[in-house]
């Protein structure tokens, strides 16, 4: 007996019973983003490995441990994208979208990281990413946050809270980095292996550690907010004022640093406790140096990404899972000549009634078996064509969801109007 093949660990099939919820979420996001003037961009899921090493940072968990990297037949090192911002910036530079232009872009699709699979965390996961270019002020940071807050309302999410921070300029961060190294070196005995590894390469990431044994040394660390440059401080105060004016509640978290090296100034996360352990459902910030870092001209930029699996889990935890759409009608056919007539009728109904969900019986079978299939499909009506209906030019309509509903013969040329009245 041959081995049964299964999906790769951490990579899941989305089955027909679940796809309506995905489609509903995706449609809500599409409509909202269009309303704010954002345009869709689609990038490859495979990029040169160098793109992520240069953008995310070589001394990060993603690049060091989590990327799916392989060598193609030409000897080039390629990587399945672990996030979308770097690819979006690469596309913007390559196609001339960014020079002296403002852009509001978004994308949707799978990302890949070789992490330990757990609740809300997968090796193939899906994100909606939003990126803005050419806008330097705190107003665009506020717009991104306000946009996500509106999406939470559209989706009926309540158990999410916003944390914000500022990482300052590159120069201010370098000076703060030296202070941080000095602080952690003085408490080296409590640092875990991961923190010691990061101490001289990426000390800000130590602030993001979840190790309870390091909680006190992290809490007592100097705050980056106390060492911001004046421009970054003014930018952050402007953002806080705009969010307050918009009625957006937030908490300033000085330990919020984000896991990607390209962030500067504003960073933010939307967090929930509704999925068990604290989880981030949306995160972003500014990355003003990334376009130049990847070979373009200096361009201010900001964006965010949200995980669809986590959002769907939140929606379902709140009891708001959208119902799966069911067929309006199921067409049952039995007898000589009925299949050809049934296919012609189905197409004429689809022409007359855009949006009609009509399933035509396939694979034959008697009327009894077909009506059982119709019932299992969830259709409201069974449309029946037998040899007698074919000869008389009628369709027998049988209600499937009405207690005591009586079947009736409807003339073929009046069926479209009959269905329009039933389905609206």
Swiss-Prot record:
It is an enzyme of class 6 (ligase). Gene3D superfamilies: Anticodon-binding domain (3.40.50.800), Bira Bifunctional Protein, Domain 2 (3.30.930.10). Its EC number is 6.1.1.21. SUPFAM superfamilies: Class II aaRS ABD-related (SSF52954), Class II aaRS and biotin synthetases (SSF55681). Homodimer. PANTHER family: HISTIDINE--TRNA LIGASE, MITOCHONDRIAL-RELATED (PTHR43707:SF1), HISTIDYL-TRNA SYNTHETASE (PTHR43707). This is Histidine--tRNA ligase. It comes from Thioalkalivibrio sulfidiphilus (strain HL-EbGR7).
């Amino acid at each position: 007996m041959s081995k049964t093949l299964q999906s790769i660990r951490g990579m899941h099939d989305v089955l027909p019973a679940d796809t309506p919820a995905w489609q509903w979420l995706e449609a809500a996001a599409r409509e909202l983003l269009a309303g704010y003037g954002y345009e869709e961009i689609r990038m490859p899921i495979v990029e040169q490995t160098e793109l992520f090493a240069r953008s995310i940072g070589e001394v990060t968990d993603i690049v060091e441990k989590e990327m799916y990297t392989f060598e193609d037949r030409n000897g080039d090192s390629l990587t399945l994208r672990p996030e979308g911002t770097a690819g979006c910036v690469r596309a913007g530079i390559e196609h001339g979208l960014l020079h002296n232009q403002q852009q509001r872009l978004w994308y949707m699709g799978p990302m890949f990281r070789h992490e330990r699979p757990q609740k809300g965390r997968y090796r193939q996961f899906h994100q909606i990413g939003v990126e803005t270019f050419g806008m330097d002020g705190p107003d665009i940071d506020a717009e991104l946050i306000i946009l996500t807050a509106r999406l939470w309302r559209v989706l009926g999410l309540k158990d999410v809270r916003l944390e914000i921070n500022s990482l300052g300029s590159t120069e201010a961060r370098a000076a703060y980095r030296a202070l941080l190294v000095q602080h952690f070196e003085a408490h080296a005995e409590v640092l875990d292996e991961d923190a010691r590894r990061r101490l001289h390469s990426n000390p800000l990431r130590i602030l993001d550690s979840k190790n309870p044994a390091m909680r006190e040394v992290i809490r007592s660390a100097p705050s980056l907010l106390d060492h911001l440059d004046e421009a970054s401080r003014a930018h952050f105060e402007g953002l806080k004022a705009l969010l307050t004016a918009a009625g957006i509640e937030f908490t300033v978290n000085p330990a919020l640093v984000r896991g990607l090296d390209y962030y500067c100034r504003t960073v933010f996360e939307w967090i929930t406790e509704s999925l068990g352990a604290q989880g981030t459902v949306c995160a972003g910030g500014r990355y003003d140096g990334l376009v130049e870092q990847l070979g373009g001209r200096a361009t201010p930029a900001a964006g965010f990404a949200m995980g669809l699996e986590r959002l769907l889990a939140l929606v379902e935890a709140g009891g708001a899972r959208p119902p799966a759409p069911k067929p309006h009608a199921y067409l049952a056919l039995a007898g000589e000549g009925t299949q050809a007539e049934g296919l012609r009728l189905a197409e004429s109904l689809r022409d007359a009634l855009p949006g009609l969900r009509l399933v035509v019986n396939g694979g034959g079978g008697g009327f009894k078996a077909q009506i059982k299939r119709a019932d299992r499909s969830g259709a409201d009506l069974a449309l029946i064509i037998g040899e007698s209906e074919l000869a008389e030019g009628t369709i027998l309509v049988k209600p499937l969801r009405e207690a005591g509903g009586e079947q009736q013969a409807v003339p073929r040329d009046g069926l479209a109007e009959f269905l329009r009245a039933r389905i609206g």
